């Protein structure tokens, strides 16, 4: 017999198998597999059948439960911000702004756990992260006062200023409902009626619309919020995250190269960096206006399509992301961010888009994760929750009180007077009308001129190419908007789009700014 075959003798095989099993049992202690009711599973490899050739039995509860749970693994996809990734971290307040806000999260030296969810806005779950899209930058602060959600984007402005246009805007951005294909002409048909979108469209079709990574991306509140101090004094603020990794974007050539290698490049970059201990950081800045300053601008400062040029920024803290999620679905997918999650000292402004988001985001999260979704671990506040809201599907609480109402002497729950909303003076009548100070084009021109020559050329090529396949009337209206913002910008776009420049000039001359 060949000596080399000795290792395959049956006796030696049994010894080897026994030794392997012993080594495994020493290194990994196996847990008992159970069903959802906690009962142990006897066989998870074979269905129970009526004999060797008979049908599968209905009494095989392990098989039935596995299939039932598999059929129900997914929750509704977010209608926007579906494709995302998340991480845990900490925010440390570095400045005393008690003159502006009584929120404990801003007390100098205060350390607050955070969860951040980065996302693409328009495109669906599992879409390539190289696609041109604004990026969500949403932060949940688990503060001593309750949870505060700062739900923003990488762009400092938005496409619209009134929430009543939000469903239409999203529909225009989404694929054609007939073919499920993306179609720029649908978007420009809509935006030809929305001149206030020109600045954010410029951002979208610039290289800022294709960031290289989430780590190398800034974030913005987009909206103004009110900060309220202990004396009830109000200041309007905008929040800005500044990446300490710098900013890096992809040009059109790089987009094609990256997408060919990795359609999850932004998620991979963030997860890999944190796994290696290269923790990304952002400084948080605020811009501040007094209420009386709002009337001093030639545009409406509470218009979400505008930035606040010339208003100094003040650093108030730093955030570090230092832990990846343990389970993507339970944390990143089930996290429920909403601008309505505010704490005393932070209130919404009168921004018309923000006012709609206060309802829409909380409502869509209730639709996605249920009425008790804020009780999920990733959404649960660190502070005590003491509410009379009750029942509903998947209520995992344990209430022992017989008093499910307020006020009550039997089981009193006191209100906190300092948490009342600040009083806001009002005048005028109810109305449905545009804001008075629109100024739709000036900031677009300033943005275009702030870009270097290469970035301008990339922008003109990307946006001009999209306009070239748009219907004629929408194309000329859009070109007139960009020409009104900056003549060089409009001229370059008209050339790429194959348009008559004289006609563009004539339309632009009729526009007011």
Curated annotation (Swiss-Prot):
Q: What cellular component GO annotations does this protein have?
A: cytoplasm; periplasmic space
Q: Which cofactor does it need?
A: heme
EC number(s) of the enzyme?
A: 1.11.1.6
Q: Where is the protein localized?
A: Periplasm
Recorded GO MF terms: catalase activity; heme binding; metal ion binding
Enzyme class name? oxidoreductase
Stretch list, region Disordered: 391-413
Q: Which domain of life is it from?
A: Bacteria
Q: Which residues form the signal peptide?
A: 1-30
Q: Name one Pfam family in it.
A: Catalase
User: From its record, what is one biological process in GO terms?
Assistant: response to hydrogen peroxide
**Family the entry assigns:** Belongs to the catalase family.
Q: Which PANTHER family match?
A: CATALASE, CATALASE-2
Protein's name according to its UniProt entry: Catalase
Organism whose genome encodes this protein: Pseudomonas aeruginosa (strain ATCC 15692 / DSM 22644 / CIP 104116 / JCM 14847 / LMG 12228 / 1C / PRS 101 / PAO1)
Lineage summary: Bacteria, Pseudomonadati, Pseudomonadota, Gammaproteobacteria, Pseudomonadales
Gene symbol here is katB
